[in-house]
A protein has these predicted regions:
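Short Gly/Thr/Asp-enriched flexible loops that form oxyanion-binding sites at enzyme active sites
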Residues: 65-71, 170-185
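Short secondary-structure boundary segments
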Residues: 58, 84-85, 163-164, 211-213, ...
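Short, charged low-complexity linear motifs
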Residues: 38-40, 158, 162-166
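A residue-level signal for conserved active-site and pocket-lining positions in enzyme catalytic cores
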Residues: 19, 56, 80, 160, ...
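N-terminal hydrophobic or amphipathic segments with adjacent small-residue motifs
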Residues: 50, 164, 168-172
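Surface-exposed, charge/polar-rich loops and edge strands
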Residues: 2-10, 14, 21-24, 128, ...
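Glycine-rich nucleotide phosphate-binding loop and flanking beta-alpha elements
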Residues: 62, 88, 166-167, 179-181, ...
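N-terminal active-site beta-alpha-beta segment that forms phosphate/nucleotide-binding
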Residues: 2-151, 155
């Protein structure tokens, strides 16, 4: 890691702390109204109406409650997918993949997000997993992302992306785990590898979702950070 990258990581860590502290001071009732307004605005947008599939997330307490979007998408017959974190650990020099909480026999080396189809109310189809995040139950069907994008070629797909902060231009500050960075990079690679990679209709639209207080002029970023196509916020 270069000195420039080290400095960027230090800046990100400091800003994450500030954003968490700032969010803790926000009024819960005001947040609920803002969440509801954002969801209604998105559901009425052409981006939502023209989409055939939505990659969503189960919100943490400091994230916009996107459940109304997910429920509307299910009712409207769209494909809805939610993530489950899969950790990779190194134990006795042997890599192992497991789901759930950190394994005490080794340290987490990295991880990824797998996505699962949700066909009913997300509250019914999820359960609390690692870090208090609600994830799809084992009864949900796991998506083969590569095949899914092959089958959906030519259709419009939306990926809702949470974050601690965004810029109006679409740059994002995540929580530091890198799960969305890796997933978005993976999706970008899948689309670039496809025979219709130059057709914008085959590429998913990355939509950052946040409160107005989470919009900043700048966030520390590195070359691998992927820009959002849209930032959904009452700020814009």
């Amino acid at each position: 890691m270069t000195e420039k990258n080290i400095n960027c990581e230090i800046e990100k860590k400091s800003l994450r702390k500030k954003m968490r502290e700032a969010h803790a001071s926000l009024d819960p009732i005001a947040k609920a109204f803002e969440s509801a307004g954002l969801c209604m605005r998105f559901i009425q947008s052409e981006t939502y109406k023209s989409s055939r599939a939505i990659f969503g997330f189960m919100p943490l307490k400091d994230e916009v409650d996107v459940l109304p979007i997910l429920r509307a998408a299910i009712v409207d017959g769209k494909k809805v997918l939610l993530p489950k974190i899969v950790y990779e650990i190194k134990s006795n020099c042997k890599a192992e993949i497991f789901e759930g909480e950190k394994n005490s026999t080794g340290e987490i080396e990295g991880g990824k997000m797998d996505f699962y189809f949700v066909k009913r109310d997300p509250i019914e189809e999820t359960e609390e997993g690692a870090h208090g995040i609600f994830e799809p139950k084992s009864s949900c069907e796991k998506a083969d992302i590569e095949n899914f994008f092959m089958e959906m070629r030519g259709e419009k797909i939306v990926v809702l992306v949470p974050g601690l902060a965004f810029t109006k231009e679409g740059f994002r500050l995540g929580r530091g785990g890198g799960y969305y960075d890796r997933f978005l990079e993976r999706l970008s690679g899948i689309c670039e590898a496809g025979e219709n990679a130059n057709n914008s209709k085959t590429k998913p639209k990355f939509v950052g979702v946040c409160y107005a207080a989470q919009i900043l002029e700048n966030v520390p970023r590195e070359t691998h950070d992927i820009k959002m196509d849209i930032v959904l916020s009452t700020h814009n």
